[in-house]
Amino acid sequence: MTDYPIKYRLIKTEKHTGARLGEIITPHGTFPTPMFMPVGTQATVKTQSPEELKAIGSGIILSNTYHLWLRPGDELIARSGGLHKFMNWDQPILTDSGGFQVYSLADSRNITEEGVTFKNHLNGSKMFLSPEKAISIQNNLGSDIMMSFDECPQFYQPYDYVKKSIERTSRWAERGLKAHRRPHDQGLFGIVQGAGFEDLRRQSAADLVAMDFPGYSIGGLAVGESHEEMNAVLDFTTPLLPENKPRYLMGVGAPDSLIDGVIRGVDMFDCVLPTRIARNGTCMTSEGRLVVKNAKFAEDFTPLDHDCDCYTCQNYSRAYIRHLLKADETFGIRLTSYHNLYFLVNLMKKVRQAIMDDNLLEFRQDFLERYGYNKSNRNF
């Protein structure tokens, strides 16, 4: 049996769904699942210190290979002692492959069998990223969990294009495995692609499962498709993945999508959503989204969320936070970011308890009704 640096332990499966309660063991510690992972694009979760992230309960954070490769450089980070030491974070870190950023940020990209040539979005210089280079960068960063280099086709691309794309992604995954210098202390995940085509998702999953990765990611979702389309893809994709390994849904952070992903057997999620919307004054609360910048909160001396026990809600009022944001004070963004991150990490804590209690569907319905989705009659 292969001795993986990343191990998944299943504790319980919810009676009425495919939801899994478990934990993932890494070289930098163990975290419970299902788990939402805050995104630290530039080796920092925007405005939050490592101590604050630990107080929130973030058992693992994500950093972006593409951005750190361009600035300050993966070799510099390696010389500093690796990403954990560089950013003073002693818990697990996951890095993406850089692929999504190449396709979404870079200009004039050209995809070939060898890799992707593109223009650096910072200075316009010509860059080349291959499966081997993506692995080399992540080996230098020293993350606990790494991603294979993949192509992330748009959800509505033609069938023939997506078929060629997933076949190339499978070949790239094999090349990445061979290039991996640190399989003893960094777990490399394969990424299942295939847009909305069930047979292509099956083909992609079969290819990657045969390569025996320590874990598997589901990519190519949350890229413009409907919530129902995402759920349909998860319905036929997660059962294709090994039960004894982690399952990671990339780029998903809306509360309803988190719960619906868990119902379909997903263990890990990440998204920039909580910090991105926080910078505009949008806060997630138990009763839905609240835009605290709005004038009606100018004299509202209550917390952002009456049911939240985070640092922000225990100490500051809507009126004060609105004042900070209107005055362009960074502390306001710190407070809203802290609250939103806490909200999603704590939501996953409640979801884990609901799995333990075998009442996840009831929890979902109650949450959606309170949050204001009015979607409690969705098909599961």
UniProtKB/Swiss-Prot annotation:
It catalyses: 7-aminomethyl-7-carbaguanine + guanosine(34) in tRNA = 7-aminomethyl-7-carbaguanosine(34) in tRNA + guanine. Belongs to the queuine tRNA-ribosyltransferase family. This is Queuine tRNA-ribosyltransferase. Pathway: tRNA modification; tRNA-queuosine biosynthesis. It comes from Streptococcus pyogenes serotype M49 (strain NZ131). Pfam families: TGT (PF01702). Signal peptide: none annotated. The keyword Ligase does not apply. The active site is at D96, D270. Its cofactor is Zn(2+). GO terms for molecular function: metal ion binding; tRNA-guanosine(34) queuine transglycosylase activity. Residues 251-257, 275-279 are annotated as: RNA binding. SUPFAM superfamilies: tRNA-guanine transglycosylase. Its EC number is 2.4.2.29. Catalyzes the base-exchange of a guanine (G) residue with the queuine precursor 7-aminomethyl-7-deazaguanine (PreQ1) at position 34 (anticodon wobble position) in tRNAs with GU(N) anticodons (tRNA-Asp, -Asn, -His and -Tyr). Catalysis occurs through a double-displacement mechanism. The nucleophile active site attacks the C1' of nucleotide 34 to detach the guanine base from the RNA, forming a covalent enzyme-RNA intermediate. The proton acceptor active site deprotonates the incoming PreQ1, allowing a nucleophilic attack on the C1' of the ribose to form the product. GO terms for cellular component: cytosol. HAMAP family: Q_tRNA_Tgt (MF_00168). The lineage of its organism: Bacteria, Bacillati, Bacillota, Bacilli, Lactobacillales. One of its GO terms (biological process) is tRNA-guanine transglycosylation. Substrate binds at D96, S97, G98, G99, F100, D150, Q193, G220. Zn(2+) binds at C308, C310, C313, H339. Keywords: Glycosyltransferase, Metal-binding, Queuosine biosynthesis, Transferase, tRNA processing, Zinc. The gene is tgt. Homodimer. Within each dimer, one monomer is responsible for RNA recognition and catalysis, while the other monomer binds to the replacement base PreQ1. Binds 1 zinc ion per subunit.
